[in-house]
UniProtKB/Swiss-Prot annotation:
Subcellular location: Cytoplasm
Gene: tsf
Keywords assigned by UniProt, alphabetized: Cytoplasm, Elongation factor, Protein biosynthesis
The keyword Cell membrane is annotated on this UniProt entry: no
Protein name: Elongation factor Ts
Gene source species: Mycobacterium leprae (strain TN)
Region described as Involved in Mg(2+) ion dislocation from EF-Tu: 76-79
Record-linked PANTHER family: ELONGATION FACTOR TS, ELONGATION FACTOR TS, MITOCHONDRIAL
């Protein structure tokens, strides 16, 4: 008896872009293990794996204040442009900045004006007629560069980045370098600060995919270590902030430009509306 359902096949197809028969076949091969099925399709070359996993139907905005960042979701971009919706988001991020609360459940119980955050969201949702959701929050307490990006001029910011950093001796250069790093993260979607921050399970998965892809392409066994190393270096270049080529000078990495300004990035966070 199959350890998966038709819904699993459809979900795998939506996630990977692979054909229905391929999805069914790989679920049979993996005995219904969804994660292994996704990895198997990546090895076989299915398109857009992982990218669709990050997508969601949610609209909304990100808001920032004093080192704090939130994502507030709604159902349509029409509501995202609503002045009351944007006002509520700014009030909530003000609560995060003042009370240093990032746990969403705890934040819902915090006060905003004469009501809780949860009550304020529920009241506006009833008035507007759409489901509203406070999705996540973050705050950094050190020196922070903030960048907000709009997808369109008539929409509120949909991408928000916080970069916590140690400044160099030249304050102006440090501020500019940190802001550039924030813009870099917004544009190229770095996932990790350095190689040391990449979880071992992620590295293991990337190694396995690189090796299996090379084998499937008929590469000789003795060449596999070099091929895997090359693919891992490509992964680091794409996913690790300090190893990415700068969007301002692609002959230099982000690390080189930060070092030139005497800036040390300690951590960052990136929120994008509707994405993981």
């Amino acid at each position: 008896m199959a350890n998966f359902t038709v819904a699993d096949v459809k979900r795998l197809r939506a996630l990977t872009g692979a054909g229905m028969l391929d999805c069914k076949s790989v679920l049979v091969e993996t005995d219904g293990n969804f994660d292994k099925a996704v990895e198997s399709l990546r090895i076989k070359g299915a398109k857009d794996v992982g990218k669709r996993a990050e997508r969601a139907t949610a609209e909304g905005l990100v808001a920032a204040k004093d080192g704090a960042l939130i994502e507030l979701n709604c159902e349509t971009d029409f509501v995202a442009k609503n002045a009351e919706f944007q006002k509520l988001a700014n009030q909530i991020v003000g609560v995060v900045a003042a009370a240093k609360i990032v746990d969403v459940d705890a934040l819902k119980g915090a006060s905003v004006g004469d009501k809780t955050v949860e009550q304020a969201i529920a009241e506006l949702a009833a008035k507007i007629g759409e489901k509203l959701k406070l999705r996540r929050a973050a705050i950094f307490n050190g020196t922070v560069a903030t960048y907000l990006h709009k997808r369109a001029a008539d929409l509120p910011p949909a991408v928000g980045v916080l970069v916590e950093y140690g400044a160099g001796t030249d304050a102006a250069n440090s501020t500019a370098a940190a802001h550039a790093a924030a813009l870099q993260i917004a544009a190229l979607k770095a996932r990790f600060l350095s190689r040391d921050d990449v979880p071992e399970d992620v590295l293991a998965s990337e190694r396995r995919i690189a090796e299996e892809t090379a084998k499937a392409a008929g590469k000789p066994e003795q060449s596999l270590p070099k091929i895997v190393e090359g693919r891992l270096n490509g992964f680091f270049k794409d996913s690790v902030l300090l190893e990415q080529p700068s969007v301002f000078d692609n002959k230099k990495t982000v690390k080189v430009l930060l070092d030139e300004a005497g800036v040390t990035v300690t951590r960052f966070v990136r929120f994008e509306v509707g994405q993981a």
